[in-house]
Every structure is written in structure tokens, then in C-alpha cells.
Amino acid sequence: MQPTPLHAAHDREIESLAEFDKVVSEHGSLARFRVQAVDLTDRTEALLAVDTAGAAFLGCPMDPEAAARVRATGALVFPPIPGLPFDPYRGSLYSPDELFASLDTGYEATPDARAYAWFQQTKADGDVFASMLRAIHDDSVSDALDELLVGTRVVGVMGGHAMARGTEAYEGAARLGRELARAGLTVATGGGPGAMEAANLGAYAAPFDDEMLTEALRLLAEAPSFTPSIGDWARAAFAVRERWPDGGPSVGIPTWFYGHEPPNAFAAHIAKYFANATREDGLLARSNAGVVFLPGAAGTVQEIFDNATPNYYESRGEPTPMVLVNRAHWTEKHPTWPLLQSLARERSMESRIALVDRIEEAPEALKRLGG
């Protein structure tokens, strides 16, 4: 899964120097373009020469003379914000390597941990400027995610963060992710630990022979949980990635709202948000091939009905498949299935929901429901 070619989806956005040079060369104008987080300090000559009326430069370092000139000709310049542990204007999604940079010196030094610390502090302060920066960041992430997923069939895999490595449930979720990826679907999860990591791991393992996943599961079981040490948990994942580089792509969509749950290292593309509501709705809305719900607690129950609501009202168009895994869990422990059935009765979503006993049945159920 590769990002969408230049401007195929958002044809007036510039997100790299190569794109900037291409637009200047081919159009001779930057009028009404949006330039995101591109260092333009070496492009002063172009900025002094071309039309920039109606353009917006979002977090783009540039020479003061160039900044003055583009403002004078009708552009908006949003300067880089010093001292932030993240770029609110970023034009791309995160990678595991970016979020876990400096892991060797301790998880607390990573950009992921530093962004979470900033979020906790500014949220406690009630700083309106920080709130604005979080909103800009999350919108930039959504924009990058939409560009990545154009034309893809996305299946969401939902489940709890408490599912430990080394368990039968974790292995089952990993095999599910692998089968879905091998079927040509893009696996998307909440991007965290537990069932989410397992499904991303399975997608990562898809290009390799079956023994790779078996061995990777064995290695990961040595650090079964992100508690008590996120560092040990993350390093085990990176050791697997180092042994088997160039794994299959998938998407993780975590949040700093639950920042104590770290992102997992097996999702190639990470859309990490500050606002959990934006993250959850975005993940479900983009799962156009359906959603598999593994056993979970309050968070997973909420996600089931977050997805059921637009299916019920058909507010996103035709209902998408919903497959719940583990009959005892969803009819006895957390009896969500009877209510979902009741809502679906005599509506078009009735033919788009299924309950299966075993995780191995989920891919066939998705296919049967039209996913």
C-alpha cells in the first residue's frame, strides 16, 4: 500500500520539496496552493518570483524576505511553532521509527512519550492555543490518512488492549490479520497493544511464509505486556521487525487521549490523534470492507454501537459488514449481540451482521456479508 500519487486526491496540496519544485516548474504559480510543513529556506528565489495569491504556507520555514513578499501578495503564512514535540502541520502519517525514535535512551525520550506529556500538561492548563494546535494536527493527520487510503478496501479489526502476547487469543488475532491482508484487504486497527497489535502483526507477516509468524509470536511472548515496561515491550517488536524487515503494510489509528497505551510497531502507517472521538469515528468510517470485533470490554462495546449507528440510519450509505467473534463473550459476558440483532431487525443492516464462535470463521463471514 503506497501513498496516493502527487495530487491525485488533494490536487492543490504540496507536502515535499519535490512537489513544490514540480508545481513551480509546471504551473509557474503557487496561487491557492496549500504548502504543508516543507522547509523552503532554499527556495527564496522561487517565492520571490511566483504568484502566491490565496496560498497558505503551513509551518514552512522560509527566509524573512520571502515570508514578507508572499504575505504582501495575498498568502497566509502560519509559521512553525517552536518547542513542540510534534508538527501540527505535518503532511504525512507517522511511522513506528518516528514515534519511537530515541527508544534506546528510554521510552520517556521518544516523540510519542513527549507528545503525550505535552498533551497532559496543556489539557490540564486549558490552554486555548494548545487546543487549536491539537485540532490542526488532527485535521492534518486525517488529510494524510485519506490520501493514503484512496481506492483501498479497508477492514477494521477491533479488540481490547489487555490481550497479552503469548496467549491463544493473541495468536488468533494475528492469524486473522494475516489472512485478511493476504486476501488483499488493508487491515486497520486502533493502533495500540493487545488485539490491535496482533492484527497489525499478522498483516506485517503476510508476505512471509507461515513459519515466520510462529517464530515471531514466540519471540514477542518474552515481553507479554506493555506493563511494567513499555520500553521492553517495544524493543521486542522492533527486534522482530529487524529480523524480518519489509513486512506487509497496515494502518494503526491510536490516540494520545489513551497515551498510557503505546502505539504498536507493526502498523506501517500510524495516524495518531489527540482527540479520541475523531480517531474512533475516523477508523470506523474508513473501514469500508467491514469491521471484525474481537472480545473486549467497554471500549469495544462502544465501538460496536458507534459503527451500528450509521449502519442503522445508512448515513454513510449502504451498511458495512459487522462480524462479532466469540459467541459466549457477546451473548453472556457482555450481551451486546441481542441488542445489535434487535436494532438490525427489518432494516438493511440485518443482512450485514454476523456472530461467529471462532476467530477462524471471521474472514468467511466478512466475505459472506459482502465485505
Residue ranges and their predicted role:
Residues 63-67, 165, 260, 329-335:
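Short, charged/polar "capping" segments at the starts of alpha-helices
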Residues 166, 195-199, 299-306:
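Short glycine/serine/threonine-rich phosphate/pyrophosphate-binding segments
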Residues 25-44, 49-53, 194-290:
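Acidic/glycine-enriched connector segments
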Residues 66-67, 71-105, 124, 132-148, ...:
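ATP/NTP phosphate-donor binding region
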Residues 57-61, 288-309, 319-329:
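Glycine-rich anion-binding loop/nest that anchors nucleotide
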Residues 5-130:
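N-terminal accessory interaction module
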Residues 11, 15, 283-285, 317-371:
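C-terminal functional extensions of proteins
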Residues 153-157, 168-216:
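N-terminal active-site beta-alpha-beta segment that forms phosphate/nucleotide-binding
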